[in-house]
Structures are given as structure tokens and as C-alpha cells.
Amino acid sequence: MILLRYILLCLVILSGTEIRAQLSEISGLVTDANGKPIAGAFLIIRPNEKMIQTGVDGRYQFKNIPAGNHQLTCFATGKQLLNFNFNCQGSAITHNFQLNELAANLNAVEINQAREDDFGISRLRAVHDFAIYEGKKSEVIQLNDTKANLATNNPRQVYSKVTGLNIWESDGAGLQLGIGGRGLNPNRTASFNVRQNGYDISADALGYPESYYTPPTEALESIEIVRGAASLQYGTQFGGLLNFRFKRGPFHRKAELTSRQTIGSWGFFNSFNSLGGTTSNGRLNYYGFFQFKRGDGYRVNSGFEQVNAFASITYDLSAKWKLQVDITKMKYLAQQAGGLTDKTFEQDPRQSFRSRNWFMVDWNLASVQLSHKFNPNTELNIRSFGLMAGRSSVGNLERINVADLGGNRTLIEGKFENIGNETRLIHRYKIGKQLQVLATGIRIYKGNTRARQGFGSSGSDANFNYITPGEPENSDYQFPSTNLAAFAEHIFRVSDRFSITPGLRAEYIQTASTGYYKSYVFDAAGNIVTQSRADEDISRERQFLLAGVGLSYKSPRNLEVYANFSQNYRAINFSDLRIVNPNFVVDPNIRDEEGYTADLGLRGKIKSSFQYELTVFYVAYRGKIGQILKTGQPPLFSNIRYRSNIADARNIGVESFFEWQVLKSDSAGRKPALNLFCNTAFVDARYINTDDKSILNRFVEMVPRFIFRTGADLRFRKWNLHGMYAYTGEHFSDATNAVLTATAVEGLIPAYQVVDLGIGFTHKWLNIQFNVNNALNEQYFTRRSESYPGPGILPADGRAFYCTLQFKL
């Protein structure tokens, strides 16, 4: 017994010696650009999540650091944010930081205290990812802190704190995202320049900017949104920029496995599994995931199955060169229940009158980014990207008030191939004592889309083969496109608090269409009387210059006042050229849209418990593309939706957001934390300057005049409880503001309100989350569709329950 105690005592002493031997320390000095010590600078070490501040002499010291990889982040108010990766092996390390006056790195500091201060949403700093955001309205959703239902990509919850968004909710599985801001159409988020990790992911950035692929929010670190002022650096869209920022592997571990398994109503199942880490020398970081998702859907005939995979490697080639490679694969098949009329929706929103409609998407993306740091003031980024993708839809496109009696279905196929490069340069220099920043770059983009439409099979299965594949019955087109662009923006810092940021973007666009379309004349019985074929070979070039300017004033009381003006441009879509659809007709003389966006806003924080933002905006269109009702051709003379440049338009609005940290927990979590937020938008969007008196001064379609979202998040120890209320005002689906039509393609979209609830429990490596979407079982719809996945009313999901089990090893 004495011998056993002696052995145990020796083991304890030896283990303690080993632990002490592995502990390290790091210390150093933090100075400004002139070498003057900075007192009160913040330093955060991860994964310990410990934060300290420098003393009056600018020095810092961390002790008792365990062995392994660590990251040290240093920042100060109004100064640069820097990261230092290091490996501890029991020795003392010295590292000094020199912080410039303008931040160049905007990656969020992912620690609990910082997330509490940011409330789950933050703003982009002046310079981020080789672009300038000074004087622009921006929002960053921090996904690490959100309580949204991530398994379903629920946009109502994920984007609840982003102001002024109209959200389509007809896709309860999160396969496609449909959001539009400030009166812009939410259709597949086409009003935004949509990217992931800074590169394009849409079908065709010029002629078909629709997003059939949506990155899973479970894999994201953040979502960055910049309003119309992003047109100078990222593209010409009126909506601005939407960028999905993927997670990276943890810096402090060689491998970390995260697995999330979710089950829910209507046979929903989602399995998300990711692996990431950093090699022992700290030079190679990797992250990847695989996702499988399936469900039967809220409505009859609305089942789906999806697979999604992603891999990313970041390698430090040297102290100045960094390489990042991304690969993405996504594929899904979904049955589409079709639309409903107003009457059938009131009877039962879950019913379906289309059992033969299917939709398939196959998306493949690749990107290579190379960054070079010439010196602390000059950096270069070269990002190349490519897409090979396709979408196919087969089904009955007839109006929903016409029964499906069988026969050949309409098959529409799109194949997308594009490649591009963006090269960006950031340069910092001083004029007097003020640091100035220049961001400049070029873009080269080449795309090709093949669009075909013809007769598919007469069955009910997911058969995407043409009856005559060599010559489809409706159309077969190639749409090549070329885009060359150059931009420059410059922050002129007049003083410590006031800056002016002008910018220019020069664009060259060449689009072409080569192919044929066929026209048919039918008798009263639906038989073909005559048919004709027209071949086309059209090319078009455009060159133009966009300009903008931003102003920013930062008061000493943590308040910023900003103003921005930027020109915008939107090219017509390929789908506006040759798509045969019995529900709408496109004007053959349709042309591009032009206009501008203007912002005036203020934002800030009161202490660390209250943040707010108030913005007034004006969006102007010249020749806005819209849809009006017209009388169709004989013999039926049915109303049709006619798509053309119907009028000029202007959108005026006010957006406000605030969040209040009512209760703030301590570092140990022994006190409860309570956050409240409120998101409000008033928008008045009308058609002006038009010869068509039927739409003069009418409301622009798909623009709710009032949007309100509010929520609360309560955390105590290992538990969190959250709830959200969302209200969207009534709006119209066409420019004539029709209230009710027989086809249900046009009509009023009534106001609706939705309540979501959730509760979660976290213990070390385990997390359990329960969500109730649409807790009050509101029966509503957000969309009337003229084509797939309709036509007609597309109901939103009713009450649904979800349970997620997550573990991290």
C-alpha cells in the first residue's frame, strides 16, 4: 500500500512537471505607425479566448499558454487589426505589433465577448478583402452567433436583422434563396451580385444572374451585404453585393470534426459533417464539408433530395505569398407541386394540381486565389474562378386553372459555362498625418449559356430527355458574353474623422444570341395549324462609365454619419429573350435598365449595450423592366403578362435597426444575458414617367410598404431561448396592381405575420437545438409565379418542428 502511494505521488509530480514544461508565454510591444506605444490596445489569444489590454507603456504579456498552435489578435479603436499565428513548445516568445490608422483586415474576432458586443450582426470596416467600404451601408451576419434554423437555411430567421429585405418563402428546404432589398425583386436573389469567398457563383453574371445554388448556412462564418454602392467594385447590380464567407479550419487544432444531424416535419432530414484544421507548422489550413438533405415537403408532390460538398485549402507559400483553392459541388432534384388559385389556396394550401413537374440543378464551382503582400502598405490579390452548371425543368406550364390532362410536358434546359478573373490592388500612403487608401482592379469575364426548350416525355417521372433532342420544338440558343471592367476607389481622409471616397468603374459588355425559335398557330381544339422557324444571329456591345462618391464622418461619441451616391446598370436577362411560356410574353425591343442609388444614414453604439442604424435611401430606374396585363391573341383573347421596359420608377424608403443588450452575462455565464432587436422598413416604390396611364403612379410590384421584424434572445448558463416575430405588409405582383385574377398569376399578396421559437442546450462538445417555425401556423404566401415552380400562388410552409443534434470533436 505504501509502495502504491509512492508511485502515485511520483506520477503526480512528474505529470505536473510535464505540464509546467509545456507552458509558454508571449509578450511584446504595441505601437502606432510612428512607433509611439498604444495604451489600451486589445489582444485576444485563441483558442484560450482570453483578452487583455496593453499598459500605459504599450506592452502586453500572456502567461501559462499550453503547447500547440495559437492565434494572437491585436486591435485598437480606429487602428488596424492584425493576427499573429504561432506555435508554443514551452519557450518564451516575443512579438511586436505596429497598427496603422486604417483597418485592412476585417475578419471577425471570434470570441464570446466580441460576439456579445456585435449582437450577431456587425458592419464591414473601411477596407476589407481588397475592397473599400468607407461611407457605404453594409451588414455582416455573424453565423456563429445566430439562433436561426440553419439546417433549412431559413431566410426569415438568418436575415432577420438585415433591413429592408423582402423574402420569398416558398422553398421551405433552403434549396434556393430569394431575397430583394429596397424594392427589388427577390427572384433567385438576381438583384444582388452573389458571391462566395469573394468570387461569382450565379449562373451568368451578365445575362442570367440568378442563384440556383445557395451555400449552406451551417458551413458559413458570415454573410456580407453591401447595398447598391457596391456597383463600383463588384458589378453593376442595383441590389449591391451578397457574399457568403465560408468557415476556415481552426488554427489551434490539426483536425476538428463537426457533425450536425437534423430531423423535422414532413420527413425532413439533414446531415451536415465538416472537417477542418491547421498543420503543426501553421502554414496549411483546410476546411471541407459534406451535406445530405431530403424531405417530403409541406405540400403534396414537393419532395426533394440534395447533396452538397465543399473543400478549401489555404497555404502560406511564404511570408508574403498566400494561396487559396476552393472546390464546390451541389446537386439536387425536387418535385414541384405547382401553384394554386386564390380559391384553392383558401380551401387547402397543402393541395397540389400538378404531379408531373420536376426541377434538377447541378452546380460545379472552382476558385484559385493568390495574394501577395509587397510591404505593409501594398497588397495584391488575384482571384480566378470558373463555373460548369446546369438546370433542367420539366412539367406542365399551363395556367393553374387549366387541368393537367397529360400529354407531352414542357422541358426547359440551361447549361452554364463561365470563367473569370479579378485582380485587385490595395495601396496605403500618407498625405501629411492622414493615411489614404487606393483600391483598384480589373475584371475579365467570359461566359456561355445554352438555353433549349422543347417537348419532354408524357410521363410523371423526373425524365429530362427531349422527344427530339437534335432540334427541340420551341428554341435552341447559345448566349456567349464577354465582360471587361476596371475600377478605382480612393479614401481621401481629410481629417481623423471625415473622409471622402470617390470611385469610377468602366465597363465593356458584349452579348450575343445565336439560334432559332419556332412559332405555332393552334386551332380551337389545340391542334397545330401552322408552324414556322426563325433563325437569329445577333450581337450587341455596350460601353459605359459608372461613378460614385461616399462621405463619412465619425464623431467622438461612437457615431458615424455617412452618405453615398452610386450609379447602377442592369443588363437584360437571357430569359427575357427567347422563352416560350403561355403565361407571359416578352417585348422583343426590351432593353437594359439604368439608374442610381443614394443613401444617407447614421449608425453607432451607446456604451456597449445598444447599437443602432437609421438610413434614408432613394433608388432611381430609367426604363425599369416590369410586367403588365395585356389581352392575348385570338381565339381565346386571354389576359397575358407582358414583360417590357414599362416605365421609369423610383423607390424611396427609411430603414431602421436597433439592438439592446438588456442584460449582460459575466465571463463565467453565471448571470443571464438578454438581447432585444427591432428591424423596420418603410418603402414607397412607384412607376413614374410612362405613356401607359394604367400604371402611372402605381406601386412597383413585389414591394411591401412596411416590413417589421423583432426578436429576443435569452441565455443563461448552458441554455438559450429565442423568439422572433415578422410582419410583411401587403403588396402586388404586377405593375397594374391587379387584386384578383382567374389565373392567380397576378393579384394582391396579402399582409402576413409569422412567429418562430427555439430553445437550445450546450454542454462542452454537445449542442441540442429545438425549433418551431411558424409557431402560430399562419396560412400565407409570399409569391405569385408566372412560371416554375408555379404558375400561381406558391404557399409558404405551415407550422414545422425541428430538432438538431450537434457534436464537435
Where do the PLM segments sit?
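Transmembrane beta-barrel wall of Gram-negative outer-membrane proteins
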Residues: 25, 263-294, 299-336, 358-375, ...
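Short acidic/polar hinge/loop motifs at secondary-structure boundaries
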Residues: 63, 199-227, 583
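Extracytoplasmic beta-strand/coil segments of soluble accessory domains associated
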Residues: 130-135, 139-141, 147-203
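Short strand-turn segments of transmembrane beta-barrel domains in outer membranes
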Residues: 222, 229-231, 241-278, 290, ...
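Face-selective signature of the C-terminal outer-membrane beta-barrel domain
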Residues: 319-330, 361-520, 554, 613-616, ...
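Membrane-embedded beta-barrel scaffold of Gram-negative outer-membrane proteins
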Residues: 371-373, 379-395, 554, 560-566, ...
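Gram-negative outer-membrane beta-barrel transporters
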Residues: 425-427, 496, 613-620, 638-736, ...
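C-terminal beta-signal and adjacent terminal beta-strands/loops
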Residues: 622-623, 673-674, 727-739, 760-809
